[in-house]
């Protein structure tokens, strides 16, 4: 732009605000100053060498993009890109008069004269006429606005010289405009005199021709009324905001919209009885407080339908006389779809049980249609006429059904979370498992298969080790018998016994606890002494079985589980030779 320093900054800020205001955009002075400082940082050449033209401005945009790639997008002011884009559009539109004012600081009077020649030379289609005073008034107004916009804030004494210099430059612009206008006026006056000097014969012209001549003469006689064809500001309409499709109504508004679509505008509100009996009392309808419904919905969402506070809110709602339709609408509006299905199912079951119990016990019969709101009591207007006793039964069933809704997550993990504790006996675990399964499904083959599968999967690690050998062949009774005395010591002892007999652990457990044979092997019980089947240890007649096992390692060789008298090793565990083993006869001689 040919100007640097504080003067260049003020001029750039004023021109920037002027250009953007013509497009209906308002930029704060602080944002404009921040953009100018960033512009100097990115393109140091711009204040001295650049100008407000499309080529230089595109170069600035490329350097801004390069700066963002090197330093990151966070280093660029948030208003930099929008301002650059708006100025690029203005420069593309070639707004000559505004750009001439922006470049006025570095243009001489002769250059201004050349630049204004194109604006002052008008064709016959572009000429506009009026009073000369009006023309100058419009020019003065535009120039004064520019001066006031630039010098609308007080400055220090050291900046007064810059201010006077800029005002002188504005006066130069006005002087060039006036000179071009005077030259144009003289040329028009010469043409007008030549036109008037022409000898016209009045008799040779028709009235239509006279009208045309008068119109043309009026144009030429109005030289004093020539105005400068100043380009008016083009005020662009702001784009209309995008109209988003409104969201569907929810809650009571959604119910109202659905009722309007179906044509059912009959409202059912809580019934209020003012008297003591149905004979001397007329029901009065009042709306359920919206605050109560919001409180109930909030409690269900935040704490769950089975929380104590939620149940208190339900009891508060139940203190009024609600019809079946009221309860269904309240449950549907506050509960989740899954919980609403559970509530409705439980409500129907409670209503059926109440009808069966009330059969023959009341003078006025209570039908299932009254409690469910079906049949002849389907419409809300018919439910309003129900007696107090029926409405009381409806409320009781609705509250009981609400309390039957399980807590969140319990219904999904009730069986998966039923596991045997580390210190819990296996028979107690089986009892809890059967109770939970039979609550969910009736007794039968399917429930037995599920219990057997969970009895293995949800057992603790100790019982699983005991059950594993007979998992596929045993029954629930075999599982219980195998885990009857389950403890770590029992498992370790069984492992030692299997190792001493040279059997696998699984084979030993099968022989001991059976595989679906009532706790015995295929050939009867197994003797722990001789390892044979058909008898137990106390009935074993084998002499070898009566010999007592050694308590530990051999004291002679230290590397075998046998008695010292039976040791046949010639070397001990360290490889040292051992003396010959003394017999009982040699020991007696030494004595």
From Swiss-Prot:
Keyword Zinc: yes
Zinc fingers classed as CCHC-type: ranges: 525-542, 552-569
InterPro entries given in the database record: B_retro_matrix, B_retro_matrix_sf, Gag_p24_C, Primate_lentivir_Gag_pol-like, Retrov_capsid_C, Retrov_capsid_N, Retrovr_matrix, Znf_CCHC
Residues passing through the membrane, by range: none
Chain location of the short sequence motif PTAP/PSAP motif per the record: 305-308
Keywords noted in UniProt: Capsid protein, DNA-binding, Host-virus interaction, Lipoprotein, Metal-binding, Myristate, Nucleotide-binding, Phosphoprotein, Repeat, Viral budding, Viral budding via the host ESCRT complexes, Viral matrix protein, Viral nucleoprotein, Viral release from host cell, Virion, Zinc, Zinc-finger
Presence of the UniProt keyword DNA-binding in the record: yes
Covalent lipid sites (N-myristoyl glycine): 2
UniProt name for this protein: Gag polyprotein
Gene3D superfamilies noted in UniProt: 1.10.1200.30, Human Immunodeficiency Virus Type 1 Capsid Protein, Retroviral GAG p10 protein, Zinc finger, CCHC-type
Biological process terms in GO annotation: viral budding via host ESCRT complex; viral translational frameshifting
Region of interest: Disordered: 151-191, 568-591
Basic and acidic residues compositional bias, start-end: 151-169, 178-191
GO CC annotation: viral nucleocapsid
A Gene Ontology molecular function term of the record: nucleotide binding
PROSITE patterns (alphabetical): ZF_CCHC
Site-annotated residues for Cleavage: 99-100, 195-196, 228-229, 254-255, 269-270, 496-497
